[in-house]
Amino acid sequence: MAQDVCPTRSEPSLSFLQGLILGQLSVVLLIAAFIKFFIFGEAPSAEETASIRATERRSRTLAHKKSLLSLRSAATQRQGSQPPALPALNKKKSSILRSNPPTLTIGSILDKTYYKVDSHQPESLDWFNVLIAQTIAQFRSDAQHDDAILTSLSKTLNGTSRPDFVDEIRVSELSLGEDFPIFSNCRIIPVDEDGLQFGAGKAFDPKQAAREGARLQARMDVDLSDMITLAVETKLLLNFPKRLSAVLPVALAVSVVRFSGTLSISFNPSNPSENTPTKMTFTFLDDYRLDFSIRSLLGSRSRLQDVPKIAQLVESRLHRWFDERCVEPRFQEIELPSMWPRKKNTRGGDEIIANIEQSINKAHGGAIAKEARQELDTETDGLRYRRRPVGDDTYSVSGSMPGSLPGIDMPT
């Protein structure tokens, strides 16, 4: 009898309503934690961030140099195991020029210019700073009177890479700064074809720099403390659940407040056999420091101002953009024009005198034309006042005509 009784079913400890409330609270807590720690979390200090980035760049540079050295050693072993190549046929050269000119190596260039790599003191580059300052000042002056840079920025920001959910980007502020970069501590360093210094930490050996691809590299410190600002405004088009259901205004201002680093410049001479022109390459070493000041504003009514996470994302993106273009081992290469003197590039001398005479003749001709116009206007005014009257009084004469008989009036 006791076995036929159904066991009582245990009721759940939490009702459906309690579970729903608990789930909603957990979602709210997760959203609050995300907003507090991810969006409004305090950003690390600038010194800490710069130290972390410098360590990452240094490790990347060391790994690149290590891979270059390993590839170079493997290539040397491979060349040693191969039989010697047959001598190439010499092309016929002009007999007018000297047949065997002395080969200019890095060692001979340094000797003839009296530059001792191991003992020469770094140069201050004051004259170079003045030239660069004049160039930048002229560029800023041209930008104030011309909208070319603003038009170019607008086209670049609104190019094909702009996402669909981002509205048209408008430049709201552009400041090119007021100060100038200061270059100093310039020194000449011989490097190999891969940009590695010969015998780093050791005395310079001219025999090592005699191989093909070696070149001289100028390294100089550069420091800039300024406020170069670019501010943009746009809207985020939130197309969910339907198109243009919500719009979020966004304003962002990025300012470069300081840059310091080491600039490396070198020349790659032309190769007539391969028809390659002379090129100048420049890059920055991995010990640079680049500081930004980033301001942000989200929303139209309930505005979120200066969100730290947005500043971190933008700054990280800008550092990555700079590293991928002109920080070693990457470099920028600029093709240089021919330095041979040409008639079409000649300025000064008789040409300046001819231009001055032409401008004087134009000014003199303009003055003569102005005087002629004034004389013509004066004659026109005189003719206007000597015009005969019109109407009934055309031939009326008051009194007697000279030479007429007294008492006889002329008929009218």
UniProtKB/Swiss-Prot annotation:
Annotated region described as Disordered, given as residue ranges: 372-412
Membrane topology qualifier: Single-pass type I membrane protein
Main location: endoplasmic reticulum
Transmembrane segments: 20-40
GO biological process entries: lipid transport; mitochondrial genome maintenance; protein insertion into mitochondrial outer membrane
Residue ranges of coiled coil: none
Presence of keyword S-adenosyl-L-methionine: no
Basic and acidic residues compositional bias, start-end: 372-384
Chain ranges of the SMP-LTD domain: 121-337
Ranges of the Lumenal topological domain: 1-19
Subcellular location: Endoplasmic reticulum membrane
Keyword tags: Endoplasmic reticulum, Lipid transport, Lipid-binding, Membrane, Transmembrane, Transmembrane helix, Transport
Family named by the database record: Belongs to the MMM1 family.
Function field: Component of the ERMES/MDM complex, which serves as a molecular tether to connect the endoplasmic reticulum (ER) and mitochondria. Components of this complex are involved in the control of mitochondrial shape and protein biogenesis, and function in nonvesicular lipid trafficking between the ER and mitochondria. The MDM12-MMM1 subcomplex functions in the major beta-barrel assembly pathway that is responsible for biogenesis of all outer membrane beta-barrel proteins, and acts in a late step after the SAM complex.
UniProt remark on domains: The SMP-LTD domain is a barrel-like domain that can bind various types of glycerophospholipids in its interior and mediate their transfer between two adjacent bilayers.
PANTHER family, alphabetized: TEX2 PROTEIN-RELATED
Protein name: Maintenance of mitochondrial morphology protein 1
Taxonomic classification: Eukaryota, Fungi, Dikarya, Ascomycota, Pezizomycotina
Gene: MMM1
